[in-house]
């Protein structure tokens, strides 16, 4: 087993005792940091940064040099799998990700390959190995993937969407085609996350960014069912240590009980869910991650500290809380406000751990 100097993130996910509440930030390697912008400029574009193991490692480590974070997260993108399936990923200025060959029908689904994580996605595994080597056991490394439903939204819509009418048309008019796509994606994500674990990821997270646009029944059928399949297929032990799994559905606060039944170790919460209520509902089964509104980081540090104190008090005494934002950090947040947030979590949380 590789020794970890700081394992409180992994311990909290498994609801084991910790000295203070661990904290990391979604998108902690990102555009709010001037050093990230410099490295991205050096890479040329976003996907070139993702595909260069040394530069991906550099941006992964940048926030850890600034802040005493309790975990590193692989620098990559959720759309690596659709890109490896041959959909022609590109980024339009001001538009976000786009695909040149979106999935429009069952015939398109039938043609999609299941990518080999050590071949078409080998650059991700190289990044994982490089980051693990450079972390030198300081903190654990989180691997991740998008959920099948969230990946499918981009693949069918051809990019980002506000109304999701194209994929919902497929869901209601040709559900068989969508289920075939989701099944193929679930197999791909399982292989991808297991490869990340074998390459050195010590915990994995599934981001279901768009699950919250579904009705409860559709969420069960088209999103949660496939995340459950992935959880069932994941390696849960590696390098002599349990590998915790976190599910995060943005807008999924009403479905926490169903999510906790998947066998995952933790649930991510967005900022619209009350953490005290979430703990009452599912805290006996899973750890909870979250859940400060990312926009709170625009506030003065004293206000940020008040919000941290409120969320810590909401969760209360005992184990099973990883502090995070309710979604990714915004690109124009002052870096010193992120620092005040991390410092406040550690300082104010000690009283909740005996």
From Swiss-Prot:
Places the protein is found: Cytoplasm
GO terms for cellular component: cytosol
Enzyme Commission code(s) on record: 4.1.1.37
The UniProt record lists the keyword Lyase: yes
Catalytic activity: uroporphyrinogen III + 4 H(+) = coproporphyrinogen III + 4 CO2
Top-level taxon: Bacteria
Site entry (Transition state stabilizer), positions: 77
Biological processes annotated in GO: protoporphyrinogen IX biosynthetic process from glutamate
Gene Ontology molecular-function annotations: uroporphyrinogen decarboxylase activity
Coiled-coil positions: none
Keywords assigned: Cytoplasm, Decarboxylase, Lyase, Porphyrin biosynthesis
Residues reported in the UniProt entry to bind substrate: 27-31, 46, 77, 154, 209, 327
Matching PROSITE patterns: UROD_1 (PS00906), UROD_2 (PS00907)
Purpose: Catalyzes the decarboxylation of four acetate groups of uroporphyrinogen-III to yield coproporphyrinogen-III.
PANTHER family, A to Z: METHYLTETRAHYDROFOLATE:HOMOCYSTEINE METHYLTRANSFERASE RELATED, UROPORPHYRINOGEN DECARBOXYLASE
HAMAP family: URO_D
Protein name: Uroporphyrinogen decarboxylase
Organism field: Salmonella typhi
């Amino acid at each position: 087993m590789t020794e970890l100097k700081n394992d409180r993130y992994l311990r909290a996910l498994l609801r084991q005792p910790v000295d203070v509440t661990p904290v990391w930030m979604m998108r902690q390697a990102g555009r709010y940091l001037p050093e990230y912008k410099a490295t991205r400029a050096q890479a040329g574009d976003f996907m070139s940064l993702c595909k260069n193991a040394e530069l991906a490692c550099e941006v992964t480590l940048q926030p850890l040099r600034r802040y005493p974070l309790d975990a590193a997260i692989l620098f990559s993108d959720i759309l690596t799998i659709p890109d490896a399936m041959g959909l022609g990923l590109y980024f339009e200025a001001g538009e976000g990700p786009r695909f040149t060959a979106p999935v429009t029908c069952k015939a398109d689904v039938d043609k999609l390959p299941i990518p080999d994580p050590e071949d078409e996605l080998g650059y991700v595994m190289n990044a994982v190995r490089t980051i693990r080597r450079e972390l030198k056991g300081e903190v654990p490394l989180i691997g991740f993937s998008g959920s099948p439903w969230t990946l499918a939204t981009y693949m069918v819509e051809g990019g980002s969407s506000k109304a999701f009418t194209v994929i919902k048309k497929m869901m209601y008019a040709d559900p068989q085609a969508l289920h075939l796509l989701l099944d193929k994606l679930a197999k791909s994500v399982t292989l991808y996350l297991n490869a990340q674990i074998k390459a050195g990821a010590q915990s994995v997270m599934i981001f279901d960014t768009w699950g919250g646009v579904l009705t409860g029944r559709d969420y069960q059928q088209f999103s949660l069912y496939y995340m459950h399949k992935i959880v069932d297929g994941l390696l849960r032990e590696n390098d002599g240590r349990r590998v915790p799994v976190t599910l995060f559905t943005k807008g999924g606060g009403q479905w926490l009980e169903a999510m906790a039944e998947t066998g995952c170790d933790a649930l991510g919460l967005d900022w619209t869910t009350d953490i005290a209520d979430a703990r009452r509902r599912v805290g006996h089964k899973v750890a909870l991650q979250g859940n400060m509104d990312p926009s709170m980081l625009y506030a003065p540090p004293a206000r940020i500290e008040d919000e941290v104190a409120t969320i810590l008090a909401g969760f209360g005494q005992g184990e099973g809380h990883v502090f995070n934002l309710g979604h990714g950090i915004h690109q124009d947040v002052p870096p010193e406000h992120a620092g005040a947030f991390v410092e406040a979590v550690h300082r104010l949380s000690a009283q909740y751990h005996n």
